[in-house]
Amino acid sequence: MGSERLLIRNGFVVSMDSDVGDIPNGEVLVEDGAIVEIGRSLGVSGAEEIDATGMIVMPGFIDTHRHTWQTPVRGVLPCCTLDNYFAVMLGSVGGHYRPEDVHIGNYAGALEALNGGVTTLLDWSHINNTPDHSDAAIQGLKDAGIRAIYAHGVPTGGEWWAFSELEHPEDIRRIRDTYFSSDDGLITIALAARAPGNSNFEVAKHDWELARDLAIRISVHVGMRLTDIEVQHVKNISDLGLLGDDTTYIHCTDSTDEELDLIAESGGTASIAPYVEMLMGHGPPPTGKLLERGVRPSLSVDVVSSVPGEMFTQMRTALVHDRILSHTDTPKEAFAPTLTHKDVLEFATIDGARACALEDKVGSLAPGKQADIVLLKVNAINTAPMVDPVGTIVVFADTSNVDSVFVAGRAVKRNGQLVDVELDSVFKKLDESRNHILSRGELLPEWASEPMAAV
């Protein structure tokens, strides 16, 4: 945790909490890593003060599904299909990862998230080729200082994905006992499951029962369109009697109306990744369909091998995609979209917290919650002048506006710079990791063998 008492002053508080509301020239008092008071002119003395003049004070973003391990091969597939991704990343590239590649991937990837104001990350880790790979992934998250859910998945390789007969690795029991005996830590654990259809039905039943035996949440990809594969993942889960409110369903882009009804009726949550879903052809993000059923989606980055690792892109993509779906071919019908900028900010904050079962801890600024706080500079050339604070966050801001980030009251970014991070060392390790991985997959550009000149 951070400083014992911290007072953030003079900022525009966008709390994402209906009771607290928005507070111009607001103050947030933090003690021992938690928020204890929010208001104006709190009259606090003896606390470390941070002047947030010209800034929005907001909760940290929550990314509910990111394959953080892919950071060392960022850009290897900038414009690919889902078929191509499975063939290259899971069928080839992932098999060349050493534990040290996983560590730098998770460490640098978590730093990237923090740099962009993401304070909570669900790390959907399907690079568990050995126990050492798993240990390295967890250590990378710990070293970065992010709040995370480590979602333990299977190793890479096609044998784990095409109606696989291989059960989820039992090593998850060791990991649960070794690292996550308590559910109150900054990093917790979930099971990154394969839907029935990716594994066979008996394996899926085993994996769901394994998660529930360990008393951990489940995160699963469903409804992704792959060529010549027709499968109703959610219906299969339902037919096996495995639906539950402990499960987050990722994508749902090709899920049927019946399947979306099943998610809603079971109390499940959803995570959409709109940029990659349209880039790779998963299918249209089902934002409106989920909302019609009372399921408020969360947002996720997904594959950092192909997608920007910040949430501003995801918010804007979700907003404009769903709004244009309201367009009709009838000129006499007025354009009448319903999704708003406030909705997508909720997706990226409090709805993300709900998808991770962390809504009592994070996702909004309120007394009693953890001090996961972002200071967003709005006295900047791309955001000034401010009229609508939520609009400023969603429509105009980007990572360059993220001035300061706190996780449980501890500063991980201040004055636009990550705290206690040797970036030159990080970049060097990323280059070395990229070269090792991609050279073995015959994907390394010729120029990459030479060090890039310092900028």
Give the location of each predicted region.
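Metal-coordinating catalytic core of metallo-dependent amide/deamination hydrolases
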Residues: 132-260
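His/Asp/Glu-enriched, well-ordered alpha-helical/loop segment
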Residues: 240-242, 246, 287-380, 396-398
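A conserved active-site cap/scaffold subdomain adjacent to cofactor or substrate pockets
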Residues: 258, 264-302
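Active-site gating loops and adjacent loop-to-helix segments of metal-dependent hydrolytic enzymes
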Residues: 72-102, 157-169, 226-246, 266-269, ...
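Divalent metal-coordination and catalytic microenvironments
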Residues: 11, 28, 33, 54, ...
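Active-site microenvironment of metallo-dependent hydrolases
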Residues: 1-26, 30-34, 343-455
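Alpha-helical scaffold segments that flank or form the walls of functional sites
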Residues: 74-146, 170-182, 431-436
